[in-house]
Amino acid sequence: MKKSVVAKIIAGSTLVIGSSAFAADDATSQAKAAFDSLTAQATEMSGYAWALVVLVVGATVGIKLFKKFVSRAS
């Protein structure tokens, strides 16, 4: 009687451990997919940021040159 109870407990714990390991694999793959998506979004946003940096620097240089030419013309 005692051996069958111990065998059932061992079988049940093996089933629980096996299913939790499977769930952990799924969670790991979901986390990896989330970080891959985040990396792709960050790369895309940095591309937009560089275009904005070029625009701001170009506008700043243009304004300074305009001020320089206006002050010399007057």
UniProtKB/Swiss-Prot annotation:
Main localisation: virion
Leader peptide range in chain numbering: 1-23
Keywords: Capsid protein, Helical capsid protein, Host membrane, Membrane, Signal, Transmembrane, Transmembrane helix, Virion
All ranges on the Periplasmic side of the membrane: 24-45
A single GO cellular-component term on record: membrane
Membrane topology qualifier: Single-pass type I membrane protein
Transmembrane segments: 46-66
Quaternary structure note: Homomultimerizes. There are several thousands of this protein in the phage capsid.
Entry function: Self assembles to form a helical capsid wrapping up the viral genomic DNA. The capsid displays a filamentous structure with a length of 760-1950 nm and a width of 6-8 nm. The virion assembly and budding take place at the host inner membrane.
Family the UniProt entry places it in: Belongs to the inovirus capsid protein family.
The protein's name in its UniProt record: Capsid protein G8P
Organism: Escherichia phage If1
